[in-house]
Amino acid sequence: MRGFHREDPARPGRRLDHPGAVLVNAGEFVLGHRTEREVEPVVAAWLRDGSIQVVRRLSQDVAGWRAAVEAHARAVAPEVGPERMGSLLVGRRLDGTPLARPTGPVENDFDYADDPLGTTTPCTSHIRKTNPRSFTDPSPRTHRIMRRGIPFGPPHDAEPGAERGLVFVAHCTSLAEQFEFQQRAWANDPSFAGGATGAPTGTDPVIGVEGGGTVEAGGSRGELGFRRFVRTTGAVYALVPPVSALRLLAAGRPLPR
């Protein structure tokens, strides 16, 4: 984040000693700071340096996902196989490397500028639906979130019937323009492509609502139906106050307006 991390003088806009890391204005994640829209929001003094937190408990149907991926592979191009089909739906391979070619010195430094129709990374793939990178106006950086995932439950192959999933934690400064925007306007909107106008797309196959999408593989194009494999079983929207506010509360002092 700008103001928290040092900028690389040789690559303006990039973080020093972190190839591929783009600096984003702190106001996207920390209240009271300049945002990517070059606006400095007015917030109460005690809120400055705080953040808004999203916590979701996500139950994952691993067996259902695997069965669907195998069926999709057979339907589109049998020679592709389920592992390749799964990579196309997610946008990354099993080892985490993206399907998109890197534009910088590290694999995770990539965009979709050379893939407007989604022939390499399908426009309906999970990582493209939730972060279209070089496509959309204004910049996708105005809808970013800072997030982490905490898995729970045993590995699927060890205990297939056990409950498993992910505790999703994110930080932002506007639920409507960041977290909920990603869900509503990108992941769940079957018409949003994150690519060229008219590019084949669909709903997000991983976290989206039930729907479908278009995937090309093995020289064939398939229209796939997606059901829900990830369900929210608990959620919290919370305010994370700044340390300064916590100190005032601990001392029994009033918060400044």
Where are these regions (language model features)?
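Long, histidine/aromatic-enriched segments associated with O2/redox biology
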Residues: 1-257
